[in-house]
A protein has these predicted regions:
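Glycine- and acidic-residue-biased ligand/ion/polar-headgroup-sensing regions
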Residues: 65-86, 123-124
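Short hydrophobic beta-strand segments that form the core of ligand-binding sensory/regulatory domains
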Residues: 50-52, 70-72, 116-123
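Short hydrophobic/aromatic patch on the recognition helix
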Residues: 247, 251, 296-297, 301
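Conserved phosphate-binding and hydrolysis motifs of nucleotide-dependent enzymes
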Residues: 256, 290, 301-302, 306-309
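N-terminal low-complexity or simple alpha-helical regulatory segments
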Residues: 1-65
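Alpha-helical bundle regulatory/interaction domains
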Residues: 82, 88-213, 233, 238-244, ...
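Terminal helix-turn-helix DNA-binding modules in bacterial transcription factors
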Residues: 217-225, 229-230, 234-237, 253-295, ...
C-alpha cells in the first residue's frame, strides 16, 4: 500500500534507498547525473520533500492527479518544466511555485545542471482533514488557497516574500535533524503566509512558448560551442526568429544572466584554459576568444576571474611546480 501511494504521487521510476517511519530516501532517475529526494510523510495528505539534482533532467514524469497541490521553493539552480500544452515555466533561486498536479508535465529539466529545493505536497481533501484535526483553532481553507493562487488552470510563480524565504531557510537548516512536529509547524506557517500574502505579491507566470524556449536553448549551446563569435542582438533575433525583448528576458529567465554576460563568462573560461597551457601570448589568447584589444580583454578577464590574465597564468604555473 505504501509503495502504491509513492508511485501514485511521485511516479513509478523512483528507487527506494531507505525507509523508516515517516522518512523515505529515494534515488531519482536522471539524464547525465544524479538526483535524490527525501520525503517526510507528516500527516495523511501532507508531505515535505527535499530534492537535490546534479543533472540536466529528471526522467520521472509527474502523475496527473487533480487533487494534489505542489508548493515548490527553489534554493539553488534553475528548474524548467515543460507542459504538454507546449509552454515552459521556470523556477529560479528564491522563487516559489504553486501548481496543481492535475496539469500534466511531460518533462522536467535543470538548465544550470543543478537544482536544490524543498516542496510541500498536499492531497487537498486528506490534507484539509488532517490539518483541521491537528490544528483545530486555525482557519485554513486549502481549496480557497488553491483558487487564490492558481485560479482555474494557472500556476503561480513568484519571488518568495522575505518571511516565506526565512521559513523555508529554517527547514533547510534543520534538514538533517528534522523532527515531525517542527516540520509540521513550519509547513503550517508557510500555508498561512501564502493565505495572507498581499494580492500585489501574486504576480504573473514567467512561461514561454516552446519555440522560444528551444530557440534560447539553441543560442546557449551555440555560445558554448563558439564563444569567440560575437553577434549583435539584431542578428541573434534574426537567427533564432525571436524578438529582442523576448530573447533577452527568456535567456535571463532560463539561465539567470544576460546573453552577453554569459558570452563573456564562456570566453573567459576558454581563455583561462589557454592560459594554463602556457604556450600562447596573452594577446593571441585575447584574439582567440574574440578580443582585438588586449587591454579590453584583460579588463574583462579580471571582471570575471578576479585577477589579471598574467596573474592567473603565474598562479597556475606556481601550482604546477
Amino acid at each position: 500500500m505504501k509503495r502504491m501511494m509513492e508511485e501514485r504521487v511521485y511516479g513509478i521510476s523512483l528507487e527506494v534507498l531507505y525507509q523508516e517511519g515517516i522518512y523515505s530516501l529515494y534515488r531519482m532517475p536522471c539524464l547525465g547525473g544524479t538526483g535524490c529526494m527525501k520525503r517526510y510523510a507528516l500527516l495523511p495528505g501532507v508531505d515535505l520533500v527535499y530534492s537535490r539534482y546534479d543533472a540536466g533532467s529528471c526522467l520521472t514524469q509527474s502523475p496527473v492527479i487533480g487533487t494534489l497541490m505542489e508548493i515548490n521553493h527553489c534554493r539553488h539552480g534553475r528548474f524548467e518544466c515543460e507542459f504538454r500544452m507546449g509552454s515552459y515555466a521556470y523556477l529560479a533561486a528564491g522563487d516559489i511555485c504553486v501548481n496543481m498536479m492535475g496539469h500534466p508535465t511531460s518533462s522536467s529539466s535543470f538548465p544550470l545542471n543543478v537544482y536544490e529545493g524543498a516542496a510541500i505536497i498536499l492531497d487537498l481533501p486528506a490534507a484539509q482533514q488532517s490539518l483541521a484535526r491537528a490544528f483545530p483553532g486555525i482557519c485554513l481553507d486549502l481549496n480557497r488557497l488553491q483558487q487564490r493562487l492558481c485560479g482555474e488552470g494557472d500556476i503561480f510563480v513568484n519571488h518568495s516574500t522575505p518571511v516565506i524565504a526565512q521559513t523555508f531557510d529554517c527547514l533547510y537548516a534543520q534538514e538533517n535533524v528534522l523532527t515531525p512536529d517542527y516540520a509540521l509547524l513550519k509547513v503550517l506557517e508557510i500555508l498561512l503566509l501564502l493565505r495572507d500574502m498581499p494580492e500585489e505579491s501574486s504576480g504573473g507566470v514567467p512561461y514561454f512558448r516552446k519555440e522560444i524556449a528551444l530557440g534560447v536553448r539553441a543560442l546557449h549551446d551555440d555560445i558554448l560551442r563558439q564563444p569567440d563569435v560575437h553577434l549583435p542582438i539584431e542578428q541573434l533575433c534574426a537567427r533564432y526568429s525571436i524578438g529582442s525583448t523576448v530573447l533577452k528576458s527568456a535567456f535571463k529567465a532560463i539561465y539567470g544572466q544576460t546573453i552577453y554576460a554569459f558570452l563573456r563568462e564562456c570566453r573567459m573560461q576558454a581563455a583561462a584554459a589557454s592560459l594554463e597551457g602556457g604556450g600562447k601570448s596573452i594577446a593571441a589568447i585575447a584574439a582567440d576568444v574574440g578580443y582585438e584589444n588586449a587591454s579590453k580583454f584583460s579588463a574583462a578577464f579580471r571582471g570575471v576571474m578576479g585577477i589579471s590574465p598574467s596573474q592567473y597564468r603565474q598562479s597556475r604555473c606556481m601550482r604546477s611546480l
